[in-house]
Amino acid sequence: MKRTAFFISDGTGITAETLGQSLLAQFENIQFTKLTRPYIDSIDKARAMVQQIDAAAERDGARPIIFDTIVNRDIRAILDTANGFMIDIFSTFLSPLEQELSSHSSYSVGKSHSIGQHSNYMERIEAVNFALDNDDGARTHYYDKADLILVGVSRCGKTPTCLYMAMQYGIRAANYPLTEDDMERLQLPDSLKKHRDKLFGLTIDPDRLTAIRHERKPNSRYASFAQCEFEVREVENLFRRENIAFINSTHFSVEEISAKILVEKGVERRLK
């Protein structure tokens, strides 16, 4: 079965997309065409959006699923005329909260991601800059300022995990790729030893690692299954020998990996 899903917002669309994606992921037997439509903030844009929704309904033979965080009532009224199954995220959750808290919500456009929260904004920017500056073992002399240091073989998911934790939690995460030289020495590099309490390991299935490396350097020794299998085996042995906690990233999303790491290490998010 195939259905179209729209994530519609008069802001960035982040809230609608994040919640919508999480809900749709529960229906593995259905193939969704997912379309994000941010900044639907005028009557004309709303009318054009209705045309897109109706066209998708006619094409699929089933009405699209609509996740929206539209605040403006006039724009909402126009969207409600579309041939779609509408899920108004704000009204779904805010109305019960208003009753429980005996208070009216501000119901503001872009409130959840407002730059007005200056301290959070600056924490996020600083964390992202830290992740980029300390990517791939680039600046080990700044590890004393890191909240976490991810270690593992090349291309096992360290960089995207560091960037996600920076964006989502304000965590200052560095990453260090373990090389064949590190494996042959059978011990941690000197630059990591004094930061042992910050280390967390990522590993990956060798066949998945081979596929990822082939995209970067096809038909190379670096991407061969034998090399990937060797590196993964040796790095996992190193993790066990040095008593470094680690997880296999193969079957987890970056969101799941990040959450598991923070729980395991007991690191508190900087963004409140």
From Swiss-Prot:
It comes from the Bacteria. The keyword Cell wall biogenesis/degradation does not apply. Keywords: Kinase, Nucleotide-binding, Serine/threonine-protein kinase, Transferase. Its EC number is 2.7.11.33, 2.7.4.28. It is an enzyme of class 2 (transferase). GO terms for molecular function: ADP binding; ATP binding; phosphotransferase activity, phosphate group as acceptor; protein serine/threonine kinase activity. ADP binds at residues 152-159. It catalyses: [pyruvate, water dikinase] + ADP = [pyruvate, water dikinase]-phosphate + AMP + H(+); [pyruvate, water dikinase]-phosphate + phosphate + H(+) = [pyruvate, water dikinase] + diphosphate. PANTHER family: PYRUVATE, PHOSPHATE DIKINASE REGULATORY PROTEIN 1, CHLOROPLASTIC. Belongs to the pyruvate, phosphate/water dikinase regulatory protein family. PSRP subfamily. Bifunctional serine/threonine kinase and phosphorylase involved in the regulation of the phosphoenolpyruvate synthase (PEPS) by catalyzing its phosphorylation/dephosphorylation. This is Putative phosphoenolpyruvate synthase regulatory protein. It comes from Ectopseudomonas mendocina (strain ymp) (Pseudomonas mendocina).
